[in-house]
Amino acid sequence: MELKDNALSSGSQTLGINARPVPQVRVALPDYWTFAGGWLGIKGHIAYGKFTDDGWQKDFTDQKSKYTEDALYHSKAGYLRVGHAEKTRLSLELGLEMATLFGGTSYRKWENGQLVGVKNGTGLSSFWNAFIGGGSDVGEDVYKNVEGDNLGSWVARVNYDAPTWNLGVYADHFFEDHSAMFHLSHNGYGTGEEWQVKKENRFYLYDLKDIMLGAELTLKSCPWARKIVVEYLYTKYQSGALYHDHTANIPDHLCGTDNYYNHGIFTGWQHWGQVMGNPLYTSPLYNADGTVQVKNNRFVAWHAGVSGSLSRALDYRLLATCQKGWGTYGNMFPHPRRNLSLMAEATYSIPKSGWQVAAAAALDKGSLLGDNVGLQLTVVKKGVFK
């Protein structure tokens, strides 16, 4: 997870760490490769893989609602850093993260209520379309979209490194299509026999409302509160509440109701029932009706995290999140649902042994996730067993 603290952040919206990892082949520049005298740096990756939750999807849905088999995975990301690490305290990081779920077989209900499997593309052209965001899905005719479930985030971070502290302020803007990626869509189609012809250079502009904003403060000489993170997330807009494909009679083309993390053909941005981005999007694993879909993707949330050391051997971590959810555009909650999540963790490192023992306690309170309590014990060995 890039440009955010992996231990304290609520998580990236595209390439998060909430779900089981997807087995993949990856080519990457994991650290910044600098040029222009050290003032510029780039890093990134390209990856292809295969999802492994076919059996889970069949069991969870009982093969009575939409699921996929043998789906493939693609992700890519590129980041640019501006600023010299040794000559300036200020630096800027910009990035684009994108991912695609494609291939395999999609099982979904048709108008007669029967569950029918559709074989998606798996040839070289499908791998290329996943990379460039092109092509169209099997069965699409009049209204063609790109092949697979495509999504991503524009990310940015400004850093200031002072002698005794470091501050990073960052943003993560998620998108599911061009309306949120570029904030515009073509809206100049003709009518009648020319309803599929782009007659005018007219575009519909979309607001920048959905965003994740965060601040990360590191106190270099304060071990008891070494790092503090605060984040705000807003996802209610989703390019607006209206969706309309242009027709012969009504040429207006509106691309709203983006329905984050869901997809009409595939089972959305999830793996083994857990969303693969930010966990504040309610994971399908919580669904009591056995459907693989995200039922709450329109929400406002505040998140905070603090970590530090109480002694040389004892570290701690505290997380707190409050959230208000409205469901989805297609299935709104009758009343907004709220949730409060808290977690406290302590980690003890046994001196000169390589052993660590961590204990954590967490709870959820509210109507969004219900009232839950959890405990976790972790034992870690670093180095060689003797």
Summary of predicted features, one role per range:
Residues T235-T328:
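C-terminal structural cap/anchor segments
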Residues S9-L15, T61-K66, E140-K144, K198-F203, ...:
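Extracellular loop and loop/strand-boundary signature of outer-membrane beta-barrel proteins
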Residues M1-E2, D31, Y48-D54, L96-F102, ...:
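Transmembrane beta-strands of outer-membrane beta-barrel pores
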Residues Y32-G44, R81-E93, Y160-G168, L219-A225, ...:
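Short loop/turn motifs that connect adjacent beta-strands in outer-membrane beta-barrel proteins
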Residues Q24, D371-K386:
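Outer-membrane beta-barrel "beta-signal"
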Residues G44-I46, L92-L96, L167-A171, I228-V230, ...:
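Membrane-embedded beta-strand positions of outer-membrane beta-barrel proteins
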Residues L92-L94, F102-T247:
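Long, internal scaffold/assembly segments composed of regular secondary structure
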Residues E2-V118:
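Internal, well-ordered domain-core segments that constitute the primary functional module
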